[in-house]
Amino acid sequence: MMIGKTRSLTFTSLFFLLVISLIVNSYIFNSLLIINIFLISSLISLVITKYGFKIISRLNLLQNIRSEGPSLHFNKTNTPTMGGIFIILPFLLLLLIVNNYVDSVGILLLFFCTISFFIIGFLDDYLSIANKKNAGLKSNEKFTLQALIAVLFIIFASQSNYINPLITISNNWNMDTNIVIFPICFLTLVGLSNAVNLTDGLDGLAAGCSAIVFFGLGTEIFIKGQKDLIIYGLISYAMSGLCIGFLKYNKYPAKIFMGDTGSLTIGAALGSISILTNSFFTLFIISGIFITEALSVMIQVSFFKITKKLFKKGKRVFLMTPIHHHFELKGIKEEKIVENFWKVNILLIVLGIVLKINL
């Protein structure tokens, strides 16, 4: 990324872009609370990350880089990890505070799902550090735990009438999914959690995209105009702010990584809010970066297995997946890849909101 006079989308420009957009939103929705929540959340995350990553470093909670990854990443070894703590703990505290003022089963469900995935991510990171290699929980163990939590969340959400088979496309258009809504919810929760986790492979990529997506989700919820859902819009803006504050120290070159503690949980929180607010259609658009990252891995693995079975030698579609590594091996600088992914994500937010308003 160029330094000096540049049009690059840096951390500072991304921050002010979101702030300006939030000011516009505050004017449109007549609520200064929106901008206040975002700024306060950003400041909280910024401060606790600034001092927290030093504590994590002293505790030797350091990242192990997988040997199969790009060789350029080997110099990231021993970077403090598990920084997602500084995003998720304030978020959980916020939910507890909100629950004191808002009598909503949905807030409790969101808290349950967030803290459960947080525990999975924390355990995965801890085992990875303890084993001194980039391998914590086994993939089948992690998926089983995620699936169990997702099923419990869906059952309780359904019993509390938060799951509606009529997926809202726009204010005037609903799509009846019938019982298919349940696997959709499962894929949204588990799939998005793992998709954000896969995206967290470059400095600032997952944190920046998460900040943008939560911003878009918050805006979509406000556009719905349902008073009982407004609180989830405010919560989404708060999470966007928390991710931005963390991004200050996670951007290239990263002083701290969020780890699975952060990425798995952020994806789960994003999926949970989308389920509780019936925001599937918009989520599918604004989460395009996360979905693309996950699909690139699925395509790569499937194509390799099929070609190996047919030709006795597996072939690859991409140089390496997730797809951000493909661009790295193409010779594009890490910070440039992240910058371009942020830009694409912002365009997806605009597209999602425009479609929401005009369909």
Swiss-Prot record:
Its main location: membrane. It is found in: Cell inner membrane. Pathway: Cell wall biogenesis; peptidoglycan biosynthesis. Its EC number is 2.7.8.13. GO terms for biological process: cell division; cell wall organization; peptidoglycan biosynthetic process; regulation of cell shape. One of its GO terms (molecular function) is UDP-N-acetylmuramoyl-L-alanyl-D-glutamyl-meso-2,6-diaminopimelyl-D-alanyl-D-alanine:undecaprenyl-phosphate transferase activity. The chain crosses the membrane at residues 7-27, 28-48, 82-102, 103-123, 147-167, 179-199, 203-223, 229-249, 256-276, 337-357. It is an enzyme of class 2 (transferase). Its cofactor is Mg(2+). Pfam families: Glycos_transf_4, MraY_sig1. GO terms for cellular component: plasma membrane. It catalyses: UDP-N-acetyl-alpha-D-muramoyl-L-alanyl-gamma-D-glutamyl-meso-2,6-diaminopimeloyl-D-alanyl-D-alanine + di-trans,octa-cis-undecaprenyl phosphate = di-trans,octa-cis-undecaprenyl diphospho-N-acetyl-alpha-D-muramoyl-L-alanyl-D-glutamyl-meso-2,6-diaminopimeloyl-D-alanyl-D-alanine + UMP. PROSITE patterns: MRAY_1 (PS01347), MRAY_2 (PS01348). Keywords: Cell cycle, Cell division, Cell inner membrane, Cell membrane, Cell shape, Cell wall biogenesis/degradation, Magnesium, Membrane, Metal-binding, Peptidoglycan synthesis, Transferase, Transmembrane, Transmembrane helix. InterPro entries: Glycosyl_transferase_4, PNAcMuramoyl-5peptid_Trfase, PNAcMuramoyl-5peptid_Trfase_CS. It is a multi-pass membrane protein. Belongs to the glycosyltransferase 4 family. MraY subfamily. PANTHER family: PHOSPHO-N-ACETYLMURAMOYL-PENTAPEPTIDE-TRANSFERASE, PHOSPHO-N-ACETYLMURAMOYL-PENTAPEPTIDE-TRANSFERASE HOMOLOG. Catalyzes the initial step of the lipid cycle reactions in the biosynthesis of the cell wall peptidoglycan: transfers peptidoglycan precursor phospho-MurNAc-pentapeptide from UDP-MurNAc-pentapeptide onto the lipid carrier undecaprenyl phosphate, yielding undecaprenyl-pyrophosphoryl-MurNAc-pentapeptide, known as lipid I. This is Phospho-N-acetylmuramoyl-pentapeptide-transferase. It comes from Prochlorococcus marinus subsp. pastoris (strain CCMP1986 / NIES-2087 / MED4). The gene is mraY.
